[in-house]
Regions:
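Extracytoplasmic
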Residues: 1-15, 36
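Cytoplasmic helix-loop-helix junction between adjacent transmembrane helices
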Residues: 75-114
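Residue-level signature of mid-helix packing/kink "hotspots" within the transmembrane helices
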Residues: 26-34, 118-119
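Transmembrane alpha-helical cores of Major Facilitator Superfamily
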Residues: 20-27, 54, 108-116
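Flexible cytoplasmic inter-helical loops of multi-pass small-molecule transporters
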Residues: 154-174
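Conserved MFS/SLC helix-loop-helix module at the cytosolic interface between two early adjacent transmembrane helices
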Residues: 31-70
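Helix-loop-helix hairpin linking two adjacent transmembrane segments in secondary transporters
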Residues: 110, 114-158
Length: 174
């Protein structure tokens, strides 16, 4: 994170503390991704993706309120990592549904946009952080994510029902 030097200085964090935050994030993310996939197969992927974006965006905004190591662990690792973990499986499943013969190309466009977003947001977060402080970068990016989540709630569509819902519907109609 490009605002990490500002956070480290403001909160007096050591390299070990910063590394611990990243480790706990990856631990929670890795534990929750399979659960996100399981849930994504059974419920509306539109709402899983939307709720994930909203949850992790709100957690991002709350990161700006952190005043120490423990709060950063909770907000960045548990809340943000937890939100992101449910996004991926449902998101990639939706992309696959919408692009049958062009699935690989669609995934490549998604990944390209993802990395372009990382590049642009890195610059923008550094700029905002330098002008108004590291907390402002989290408020701004969290707010942008909330707007994105609201747009997704309105515009995103589930192309087909998750397997468990479809199976339950078929069983009821017999």
């Amino acid at each position: 994170n490009v605002v990490l030097p500002l956070i480290r200085e403001d909160l007096g964090l050591s390299d070990v503390a910063v590394g611990t935050i990243a480790t706990v994030f990856n631990l929670f993310y890795a534990m929750l991704v399979p659960i996100g996939g399981f849930i994504g197969d059974r419920f509306s992927r539109k709402w899983i993706v939307t709720a994930s974006v909203l949850f992790w965006s709100i957690a991002t905004m709350f990161t700006g309120l952190c005043n120490g190591f423990l709060m950063l662990v909770v907000m960045r690792s548990i809340a943000t990592g937890g939100g992101e973990a449910f996004f991926g499986p449902a998101n990639y499943s939706l992309i696959a549904d919408y692009h049958d013969r062009t699935r690989a190309f669609a995934m490549s466009i998604h990944q390209t946009a993802y990395y372009i977003g990382i590049i642009i947001s890195g610059y923008a977060a550094g700029y905002v952080g330098q002008l108004w402080g590291w907390r402002s970068a989290f408020y701004v990016f969290g707010a942008v994510g909330v707007v994105h989540g609201v747009i997704m709630a309105v515009r995103l569509k589930d192309k087909k029902e998750p397997a468990a819902v479809a199976a339950a519907s078929a069983a009821e109609s017999k």
